A protein has these predicted regions:
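Conserved C-terminal helix/tail region of periplasmic/extracytoplasmic solute-binding proteins
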Residues: 160-190
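A generic structural-conservation signal
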Residues: 25, 48, 67, 132-133, ...
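Bilobed "Venus flytrap"/periplasmic-binding protein-like clamshell domains
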Residues: 1-61, 76-80, 158-162
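Secondary-structure end/capping motifs
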Residues: 92-172
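Residue-level "edge-of-site" marker
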Residues: 29, 52, 71, 180-181
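Pocket-lining segment of extracytoplasmic ligand-binding domains
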Residues: 34-128
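Helix N-cap/coil-helix junction residues
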Residues: 21-23, 63, 128-129, 172-173
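Residue-level signal for threonine
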Residues: 86, 156, 184-185
Length: 190
């Protein structure tokens, strides 16, 4: 089961090929953005999850998962989620974009440094959320917000190139793209 995004099936098929499995024997089911209940209810045998939320949820419920990483030797790494802007906005309102990204970076840096406090802020604005899940998720996510980047939001051209080339090979892109036109670090805080 997956969220139904066009990129998911080629990634899952690629993982299966690398493992020597036959993807044609799998029924792909779109369960929307709440895949975990489909697994628990037995409507799916395999689900695409966000480890920092669904994986934590499984752990809290005592459900053991066998995780297969989406990227590595078979599927190139890629950036997700992304903040996207139009070129015209960047040209005409670049200062606004810089301030927005600086504020966003401060928020992520605060969340990484203060996981308990940031979880409480989220719960204040999303009281329907499960406090145990929010706190455990934030504790797991905190050290990963920046990952191996020198600063929050920083992206590498080679990651874009490798994944774009893979997408082209999978016929998800009609033509190759120039990574320099796909992203920029120019608006990030220094």
């Amino acid at each position: 089961a997956s969220y139904g995004l066009p990129i998911e099936r080629p990634i899952l098929e690629g993982l299966m090929r690398c493992a020597g499995a036959d993807a044609s024997k799998v029924e792909f089911v779109d369960v929307g953005f709440d895949a975990f209940p489909a697994l628990v209810a037995g409507r799916a045998d395999i689900i695409w999850i966000f480890e920092g939320w669904d994986g934590i949820q499984a752990q809290l419920k005592g459900i053991e998962l066998n995780l297969v990483r989406l990227y590595g030797s078979c599927i190139p790494d890629y950036y997700t989620p992304l903040i996207i802007s139009g070129e015209e906005t960047l040209k005409k309102r670049g200062d606004l974009v810089r301030r927005f990204l600086a504020a966003t970076a401060r928020g992520f840096e605060y969340a990484a440094a203060h996981p308990e406090e940031s979880a409480q802020i989220l719960l204040k604005h999303s009281p329907e959320s499960d406090p145990k899940l929010v706190n455990a998720s934030q504790a797991w996510l905190g050290p990963r917000y920046k990952d191996d980047a020198p600063r929050w939001g920083f992206q590498k051209a080679e990651v874009w190139t490798q994944f774009a080339d893979w997408m082209y090979e999978q016929k998800l892109l009609e033509k190759k793209i120039d990574p320099a036109r796909a992203f920029t670090n120019d608006y990030l805080p220094k």
